[in-house]
Amino acid sequence: MLTLTPTYDRPWRQPAEWWPRLAAATDGIDPPFGVLSLEALAANAHDMLERAQGTPIRVASKSVRVRGVLDAVLALPGYHGILAYTLPEALWLAETHDDVVVGYPSVHRAAIAQLAADEKLASRVTLMVDSIAHLDLIDAVVAPDKRATIRLCLELDASYHAPVLGHLGVRRSPVHTPEAAGELAAQIVKRPGFALVGMMGYEAQIAGLGNRGAGKAVIRMMQKASAAELRERRGAAVAAVRKVADLEFVNGGGTGSLESTHADESVTEIAAGSGLFGPLLFDGYEHFRPAPAASFVLSVVRRPTADIATVLGGGWIASGPPGQDRLPRPVWPEGLSYLPREEAGEVQTPVTGAAARDMQVGDRVTFRHVKAGEVSEHLDEFVVVSGDEIVDRLPTYRGEGKVFL
């Protein structure tokens, strides 16, 4: 298993030396593959702990999708448990981990039946709910008297209803007020076959929205106001739910909100994962800057003109509102850019720039992805580099034959 030892060197701050070093270490491997710097991963993991200031971090698996990385991070004091994104994934991870919360409601009937039939799995996995309809579906799959007790987490809507701008954040739970949370909790605890053990609220408008630069002053103001509003509302909602349920945990936040979520006394743990890989998305944040721990490498397969080199693959567009900010970025060799009329393609991606003129068929281009775990869906493995050497090769979920979404 990888050991994530703290490091005080920051070689990635010299990109003209950093990227060639990683490229040289992996020169004998055929693309496409991911590259994971052990030092950068360790620095990010420890930086997140410092930012959380003692609040335990539950690792968001969707932002990693590499079991070897999950294992290494969870071995560090300060990290505990996994926030999975589907129930089939959670059941798979629960074979070796004893605390897995599914971050989204599940209606996967076969997986629910598997969970309900296994006391050990049922003790390790917690399902997310935000309405009685979720309980009804579970009961329809397996009756309460014919299954193990199902652990539940109630999700609170953590979005911000701004005075002028309206709804800010993501559309998740319909449970927005403390009153609604208390009412749903009261209904849940009356239902046989269930145990309400947790609460969750994800403040995407704070954790997932870049705020760096003079043009982002309004966003920073909104985030400050949202954090204050949520701290009061979430605290009241947790208090309302605790009147009827003995909660084991209250989960909040994400990599981008570790500081503000820690300041909420009602929160007992923070969910985070993207900061481990340090994707492009976080280059746009003012209050922290993770190391670019994860990258991916593609091969040059064509030279259509003297100014253009074409790599195989590349169109690994990040989720979210479509735009230029969702494209992977070529980072080595320096100075490469996309063609405006073609950009990143499904099977081939032409790049241009001064460096493209010197590239030959068989050369490589290193890219960074906008998001963290999404790149793992395109790769079989990450090659782990420490210093100038390959120290491990870790399969992604895809490399292990698993595709959950």
Locations of regions flagged by a protein language model:
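A charged N-terminal "starter" segment
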Residues: 1-117, 400-405
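Active-site loop ensemble at the mouth of alpha/beta enzyme cores that anchors a bound cofactor
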Residues: 214-226, 235, 256-334
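Glycine-rich tight-turn/loop motif centered on a GG-T
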Residues: 26-37, 99-102, 120-127, 166-175, ...
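Flexible, glycine/charged-enriched surface loops at secondary-structure junctions
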Residues: 56, 196, 243-249, 359, ...
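Active-site-proximal beta-alpha core segment in soluble small-molecule metabolic enzymes
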Residues: 60-203, 208
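Flexible loop/turn segments at secondary-structure boundaries
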Residues: 66-68, 93, 206-208, 257-260, ...
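Active-site loop/helix belt of alpha/beta enzymes
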Residues: 158-279
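C-terminal accessory subdomain/extension
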Residues: 303-405
